[in-house]
């Protein structure tokens, strides 16, 4: 027998034998839930892991600080490497991605007006990437969880993690109005981003953080215009970096490098388009279709890694543990490998009583994270103009680009990293 229950505005399912999830009200206006895996963070990483585990019969609760509308309103990169696309399909959430996503077989690098193609399909052994907006894939994951009555609870406040040591089961608390809700679980997944509470729950004498802050940001514009090029263009220019990207055949995304001191209000649409054209090859600039911006924002660039990615019964994933500059589109794709490792580790634990994957998670995830960090750092260093750059530095950048296109080994390395290193 089972009956529907209502938890903080999200419907779940109550099983009387308590094998999956239970909710009771305590004597002191405290609610209790029980699940196997509590996932903090309802972005694509948390939703995907929840969906994958659900399909294997492993129960989860997802806690998200913001509303669903807020999460879907975030504008993020839309280049998906092969591994992420495969995970979407395995999660039974990839149908629309496969129908509407743009398959890209390469990307262009422009060096002060000279543009050349990196044929990633050729140099990676036949792989490609999918261009599909993060907003859309998040919507698909929400829909997939809804179809299966997945428990995704929004607008949670004051999330706190407790008893993370391995000797006792952990639990998570959050505030719902005047009530405190407690979620008892076997494991906690921190997929709550850079500013979330999960990483902060690891003692400072255990956690080691590595960070590099870049002295510039990206001014991005989203517009309902035809993309200027079928494949992405990464443009190095003495005036600063530029990127021509897209979300679909009628939705374009463009970026230019700007000083950290710049504000969005400093840039009118006309000023943005004018500056973008100056950084592109003349023939590309001539065919650039301009229009009103739908969204405009400035994102600072930073590299960040936290070690370890496991502490007791807490496992970090995605931006909670690592951040990369957007150059090369590794952010969400790096999170995908975290989810892949956690998914398989949890399956082995619950279905095979094998904890090897859980024990090895941090080391395995970090090994791939640092390779993604290296590629993003290389792309950023290769294509941006740094304050204080002298003619010698500029020559080295151009020489690095020349070497890339003169060496099949270099092209193979770039292509392999762009489509995604194997999990």
Model-identified regions with their sequence ranges:
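Glycine-rich, N-terminal phosphate-binding loop of Rossmann-like dinucleotide-binding domains
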Residues: 70, 192-193, 324
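Extreme N-terminal leader/targeting segments of oxidoreductases
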Residues: 2-37, 52-56
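C-terminal helical "tail/cap" subdomain of flavin- and related membrane-associated enzymes
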Residues: 4-6, 10-17, 33, 286, ...
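Conserved FAD-binding catalytic core of PHBH/FMO-like flavoproteins
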Residues: 143, 150, 157-160, 165-297, ...
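Conserved mid-domain beta->alpha element of the FAD-binding
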Residues: 40-54, 141, 295-378
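Active-site-adjacent segment of FAD-dependent monooxygenases/related oxidoreductases
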Residues: 73-77, 81-148, 165
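Glycine-rich FAD pyrophosphate-binding loop
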Residues: 54-75
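Generic enzyme active-site microenvironment
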Residues: 62-63, 190, 235, 317
